[in-house]
Every structure is written in C-alpha cells, then in structure tokens.
Amino acid sequence: MQDVNPVFTPLDTNIKLEPNSEGSVGDQSNLFATLIGKLQYLATAMRPDIAFAMNWLAAYTANPSLIHYTAVKQILRYLKGTINIGLTYQDIPSPNIFYGYLDAVFANADEYKSTSEYVFLAGNAAITWGSQKQSMIALLSTEAEYVALSESSCEIMWLRHLYGELGYIQKEPTVLLGDNNGSIAMA
C-alpha cells in the first residue's frame, strides 16, 4: 500500500455494498476482520471521518467479498491521501458548554434497519461521536430520526455527568441539532 495513489473520499460513492452471495473467500476473511478491527479503532480514536465507511463495512466481516476488500483498500488509500488530518484540541474558552448534531440514515437495503449517527463538540473539537444500527425497523424517516434523537439524548446525559465529575457543571440546556422537522416537532 506504500505506492498506491491517494484518494480523497473514504468510500467510493458508486460502490454498492451487499452481502456476499458467492461463498466464503477462505482465510482472507481473517485478514478482512483484522483490518476492520484496526480501522475501527482508528475511527474511534483519531479519525472520525472514516467512521461512516467503517460502520457499513463492519457489517460484512463474517463473509466478505472482493467488493468489500476493494472498499477497505479505498479507506487505506484515503488515509494515505489525508495523512496530515487528525483531531487536535486547543484551549476552549468555555469548556463546560458542548453541543451536538444528530442524523439518521433511513432503512438500509439489506435489513431495512436505519442507522443513528451523532457528534458532540466542545468549542470546535469533536469530543464524542457514534454511528450505530438501530435495533428496530423504523417505518418512517421521522421515526428513525426520533430514535436517533433518543440515543443522542443518552449520550448527552453521559457527557453532562462526565463534565460534572470533572468540575464543569453545564447550567444551560444542551443544544442538539437535527434536520428532520417531524422529529423536532415531536420532541
């Protein structure tokens, strides 16, 4: 991978990820699982920009196909092209104030389950983020967004408790921004 051409998107927008119907690729599935595990750690610790791609690919760890390997190579090429990008934290004028964004990706084609995604920031730096398949099947995008809102609210409670333990009591309500008018109206 040392001599590969770098790319500037972690996942090819034209690729269609679906379950492998051609059978196992043998011992290569262990290599795939190892790569996914290492890239998941990187997405969690330092590179949230690959979290979405990693979330999708991790679903195919048990039985990957060549398309899934191609997608992992795309992520590695992306990391090579963006090697100087990472998280940096600076002094925040008001560290006890954090806010968040949430979204839901409605009903994937494989299991018809939606994905909840959120990111919370202190100042302009991400302090926590997540992307998780919802356990239920949402019938409407508004329902999927409302589930994401609920899951993000749990993260808010955890962050407020953590900040309180660190001596930073957040007196104001936590701002959580979403893009679905129906779920906002229900909240």
For each predicted feature, which ranges?
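Divalent metal-binding acidic/histidine catalytic loops
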Residues: M1-A187
